[in-house]
Structures are given as structure tokens and as C-alpha cells.
Amino acid sequence: MSHNQFDKKSQAWSALFSEPMSDLVKRYTASVFFDKRLWQADIAGSLAHADMLAAQKIISSEDHNAIQSGMATISAEIESGAFDWKLELEDVHLNIEARLTQLIGLAGKRLHTGRSRNDQVATDVRLWLRGEIDLIGALLTDLQKALLEVAEKNVEVILPGFTHLQVAQPISFGHHMLAYVEMFSRDAERMSEVRRRTNRLPLGAAALAGTSYPLDRERVAVSLGMVDEKGHPCVCQNSLDAVSDRDFAIEFTAAASLCMVHISRMSEELILWMSQNFGFIKIADRFTTGSSIMPQKKNPDVPELARGKTGRVVGHLMGLITLMKGQPLAYNKDNQEDKEPLFDTVDTLKDTLRIFAEMIGGQLNPATGIKEGGISVNPQAMEQAALKGYATATDLADYLVKKGLPFRDAHETVAHAVKAAITHQVDLSELPLAVLQQFNPGIEKDVYEVLSLRGSLNARDILGGTAPNQVRAQIARHRARLG
């Protein structure tokens, strides 16, 4: 076949076929306009493969040098926007290979020795996803640090804690923020685990059965950084599995879905808290929009969209699982459909993490070195909401238990006290001692220390509790972890 096979034939394998591919089928099967984002991974994998082929004397040093030079030219063309992506060449891999062959001739054809697009694409996606996971890990750190800053400023601010969206017990607003730090720290751990399993080399598996060429797969793995924590090469051990499974992409999307679920839960609270009915917080105007008809409105579009985009990412997870579930070994064209949901999941998660870190923690003003525009807290509104909800009722029950009353009896006694407070439209702490003693004569003046919001907060002085000194200990632990 001539050097110009990619120009004269619709595909690299078309000598077998008696008629060309129709334009409709070309458009239907092409992936180049979304998988071209893999170009850096594709070139990196090809260069590592070429290095190994030369070291194994499978290609000459002259061909090796030509491949390196050609790939440098292609990289420059892509970066400058001069590269001509062609639909008829179907994907990123054949586009780059065709251009390489055009630039350097026969040496470009020899690059594919011992390699199939099946192991090539699996390698590219793993390399690309590894880099994206690293970026996501850094963004998760930024978001956690933003939450820590808010927590540190609001350790002493009292927020009504809720169960069933009913006022339950008073908590530190800082403690509440730290709950999300814990969630995002686990998300970061999951991403790290996904990265470890993603960072394995399929290249050398060829189409499905391996190759008869004496490839040094471990050399390629090391050169691409596909190594474990001790520097040992990580190579896919079964050629069928290497080219056919996309569990690493599914696992990443599952981890991303969990992260988005945590963001969605936080979004729901931000939306509630900034509503007029709560009035607990404000977010900077740049994260809100107005109404086309109601001039008084500031709508929380960013958290609302994040809540909505969570469904989109979870949908991608279901799509990928469904994509894989019916495929026999080894590679099938179905797997081309893994890229758009994977790419969109990565883009959505990165964008969401970036915007939430800024929305919560603010943006650094380079002139002053001070962060501006983060969450603005209304402590008075929070405290009033806690008082209205009889948030210290459990504290009164605990007080009676310490006086010797069984908890179930204490629970019933306090229910009567709350009923009396509701009738008189006062907080429990505002009921006269004589009234409280009607429910249990063992109640004494010290009960008012227990019934105060501050007293309730301070009483939860246990590891993981909401007492301010425990919250500060949590903050210190997270700061040490995040650096």
C-alpha cells in the first residue's frame, strides 16, 4: 500500500472492502470531534511505545528519531490550532497517525508495530483520566480549605441543627461546615483510590491476545509514570481485560457522582439558608441572577444548577454501567460511547468544584491580599431560629436523667414542658422555675445554664461533638492534613 494510504482510503483497513463507507456511517461512527481532547495522551503513549520499539530493536534509531520529530511538529500544530482534524479519519488516533505518516513517511507506519487501537485507546483514556483526577484532587483541597476558613470564622456562631428539616439541637455553624469537609475528604480519598487503579498500562495487549513482538511493557509503564507507590511498573496482566473493561471509568464516575451528591446536599442548604424564610446567609451577587419580571429577586442559580447537574452526572454513571453490562469479551465498538459521558463528568465536576470554592471562600484580591465575596453569615437570624425551635429540649431531658429520672420518663416530662412553652409563646429558658418544677420538682435554678443555647453547645464536649473547643480541634486536624 502507498505512503498515502490515509489520503486514498477512507480508513486504515479499507483494502479488504469492496465499497467505501457512506458519509452517514462516517458521521455516525466518528469520534474525532470529542476524543481529540486525548491528543496529548495519545502522543505521550506513542512516544513511549516508539522508545520501547527502538530499545527492543524492533524499529531503527532513524525511524525512532523521525517519529519523535514528527510528533513534535504535530504537537505544535495542535497547540497552535493549525492541525487539520478530519472526520473521515474517524478518531484522534488515526488523525495523528495519518499526519505523522504524511510528515515522515514509512517510519510513521512502523509506529503501530505491536499495537492495536484497542490497547492504544485504553491507554490514552487512562493517561488522560489520571491527569484529570490529579486536577480534581487539587480542586477538592481548595474547596475544603474554603470551608475551613468559613468554619474557623464561625466556631462560636450558633445554628439550629435540623433533623427532618425540623429544629433539633443547637450546633456551631463551624461544626456544620466541617461536616462537608469530612465528606469532601472522603471524596478525595476515593479519587486517590480510583487513580491507583486507573494508572495501569494496557499497551502491549494489542487487539485482544497480546503480540508476537518482544515488547517491554514494563519499560513503557515506567516511562509513562504508570507505577505503584514503590516505583514498580503497573501493567494490565490479562490482554483481554486490558482492552475490554472500562471499570476504571465507571469507578471514577461513581466517585464523581458521590462528590456531586455532597455538593448537591450543600447546595440545597445554601438555597434554603439564603431564602427570606431563613435569612441565615448571603452569597455574593456574582453567583446569583435576577428575575425577568420580579425586580426584587436574587435567585441562587449556581447552587440550583449544581443540584441539577448532579442528576446529569449520576445519569452518566448509569449510562456507563449499562454500556458495559452486555458486552462479551473482548473489545466492542460500544466502548466508543464511554468517552462523552466520561468527559462531561470530568468537566462538570471540575467546574462545580471551582465555582463552589470561590462562592464559599471568596476570591483573593491581588491588591489587598484579602479574600472577598465569600459566604456572609447572619448569626442573629440563626440564633433566633434556634430559640424558636426549642432546640434545648434534649438538654433538659439529659438534665433530668442526671437527676436520676429514666430517660423515657424524662422525655415525656420535657414534652409537657415544651407544650407549656408553646402555649405561653416563650422559649423553654423563659419558663419560670415554678412552672418547670410543676413537671418535676427536682428541677433547680441551675437548669437555666442547661437551657441556654450556649450551654447546650458547650455541653457537647466530646470527640466529634459541636462544642467550640472540639470544633477547633477538628479544624486543626484538617489543616494539618491539607497542609
Swiss-Prot record:
Pathway assigned to this chain's UniProt record: Amino-acid biosynthesis; L-arginine biosynthesis; L-arginine from L-ornithine and carbamoyl phosphate: step 3/3
Cellular component GO terms held in the UniProt record: cytosol
Subcellular location: Cytoplasm
Main location: cytoplasm
Keyword field: Amino-acid biosynthesis, Arginine biosynthesis, Cytoplasm, Lyase
Gene3D superfamilies assigned: Fumarase/aspartase (C-terminal domain), Fumarase/aspartase (Central domain), Fumarase/aspartase (N-terminal domain)
GO biological process, one term: L-arginine biosynthetic process
GO molecular function, one term: argininosuccinate lyase activity
Membrane-spanning ranges: none
PANTHER family recorded: ARGININOSUCCINATE LYASE
Family membership noted in the UniProt record: Belongs to the lyase 1 family. Argininosuccinate lyase subfamily.
Classification via HAMAP family: Arg_succ_lyase
UniProt-recorded name of the protein: Argininosuccinate lyase
Lineage, uppermost ranks: Bacteria, Pseudomonadati, Pseudomonadota, Betaproteobacteria, Burkholderiales
